[in-house]
Amino acid sequence: MILYFSATGTNKYVAEQIAKAIDEKIVPLKELVRQKKYSITVPEGENFGVVMPTYWEGLPAILLDYLQKAEILLEGADHYCYFVATYGCDYGNVLSTAQKEFGKVGIQFDSLYAARFVDNWSPMFYLKNAERNRRAEENGEAETRII
């Protein structure tokens, strides 16, 4: 299972690429919130991945709010848990923050990754440089393949 949040499509793309590579299903966080589903059960032997954007070097509010209400149950003992943060400029302490926040609900990540893509927060960054954006997208895709 890969839990993801994507406001612009980047994280959905990353989650889909990982899911395709390891034959996992993706679960949009927005749907869990909309359905008020705050309990997740991960069957024994299934991986648990999380793909999130970096917001101001931290986690999105929708995820932090969800984790305050969530119960995540890993059945059995055979799980590989990982977290992927996408970012455009700097990912700051998002990986250690993810480890801390998910630790509060009993999840310890085996691996933490950061993949750089185009920074798409338009009030702060100039997005019209097609060549720069193309290079950033290629970089993000290459980093996603490594993950």
Region roles according to the model:
Residues 1-2, 6-14, 18-34, 38-147:
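FMN-binding flavodoxin-like domain, especially the glycine-rich phosphate-binding loop
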